[in-house]
């Protein structure tokens, strides 16, 4: 049986293009606005959505996503609240894959078995948990896959040939290549280096390889899309939402439209790079 992720990548391949993967923080700046943004992403051209789980110590995230997480936590966002938003989204959209991205601690506190059962029931398609290495696969990776969800692993510029097989061993859904060394949103990737890295990973796996970190514009997305199976954009979208908020950090009438406008530009870039 194919999954929503399988179907999405197959559709994009049939169209001769990469997938656009968009990241936003659940509950930013409040749960209802966050749900409106989530609904708007596929309407504006996103193929896959990543929904961030807010956490108090997000070590891999840059200032934009850290600030988004703090806004979400201030608004009362929780793991169960995030699953409730996915459930409401899934009641209207049965085709767009939803990946939850975050850190292990909130899931551990929630309870792994309970979380996985609730995630499946809500309509989640996979997880990206950035602080669990392959050596800890028994903790979450293997139970996630046994529950029928994808467990997506990160590869980085420092993942060498000795380490790569371990990274890929229990990865499913797709491989997420982090195009820069550092935190999210911190630099523009070296597109030549990215192309070589994608080729190196593809030689080791049949899974789609998507590239993220540092992608800010439609032109950046087009450059990555020419060589990868997918392009992830996160900090730029979180920034667009943040700039639309009022002085008290609350959503305005233009908040959802601000995110949608950038997604349309990114989608146009990805489609312009169709091969």
Curated annotation (Swiss-Prot):
Listed name of the protein: Tryptophan synthase alpha chain
Matches recorded under PANTHER family: TRYPTOPHAN SYNTHASE ALPHA CHAIN, CHLOROPLASTIC (PTHR43406:SF1), TRYPTOPHAN SYNTHASE, ALPHA CHAIN (PTHR43406)
Enzyme class: lyase
Record-level GO cellular component terms: cytosol
Catalysed transformations (reactions): (1S,2R)-1-C-(indol-3-yl)glycerol 3-phosphate + L-serine = D-glyceraldehyde 3-phosphate + L-tryptophan + H2O
Associated pathway: Amino-acid biosynthesis; L-tryptophan biosynthesis; L-tryptophan from chorismate: step 5/5
Keyword terms, alphabetized: Amino-acid biosynthesis, Aromatic amino acid biosynthesis, Lyase, Tryptophan biosynthesis
Organism field: Methylobacterium sp. (strain 4-46)
A GO molecular function held by the record: tryptophan synthase activity
CDD domains from the UniProt entry: Tryptophan_synthase_alpha (cd04724)
The EC number(s) this enzyme carries: 4.2.1.20
Subunit record text: Tetramer of two alpha and two beta chains.
Protein task: The alpha subunit is responsible for the aldol cleavage of indoleglycerol phosphate to indole and glyceraldehyde 3-phosphate.
Active-site positions on this chain: 50 (proton acceptor), 61 (proton acceptor)
Pfam family, one: Trp_syntA
Family of the protein in this entry: Belongs to the TrpA family.
